[in-house]
Regions:
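Absolute protein N-terminus
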Residues: 1-2
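Short basic helix-loop element that most often maps to the first helix and adjoining turn
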Residues: 6-19, 77
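Residues in the recognition helix of alpha-helical DNA-binding motifs
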Residues: 9, 23, 34
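Short, composition-biased local secondary-structure segments
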Residues: 17-27
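DNA major-groove recognition helix of helix-turn-helix/homeodomain DNA-binding modules
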Residues: 24-25, 45-62
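Recognition helix of helix-turn-helix/homeodomain-like DNA-binding domains
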Residues: 26-43
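Helix-turn-helix/homeodomain-like alpha-helical modules used for DNA recognition
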Residues: 60-79
């Protein structure tokens, strides 16, 4: 999961940085720092796991490989 994917996923579910922070117990400052990076984020494994699991629970699927155009897909009840 890349920094860009986190930012795309957050936008897809319509959450602000503060909303993601509230849902994950990861500080908004940390999320801002992660999203400002390029590629694979330098962050603790625990924080990245919390972010991933929270976004996946909201319907996000992380697709692609970091070096091959990674993206996200939002699954809804209609998919």
């Amino acid at each position: 999961m890349t920094s860009e994917q986190i930012k795309m996923a957050r936008a897809a579910v319509g959450w602000s940085i503060d909303q993601l922070a509230d849902r994950t117990d990861v500080s908004s400052r940390t999320i801002k720092r992660i999203e400002a990076q390029v590629g694979l984020p330098a962050a603790t494994e625990a924080n990245l796991r919390l972010i991933r699991e929270t976004l996946e629970a909201a319907g996000i699927e992380f697709i692609g490989e970091p070096g091959e155009g990674p993206g996200v897909r939002l699954w809804t009840k209609q998919n």
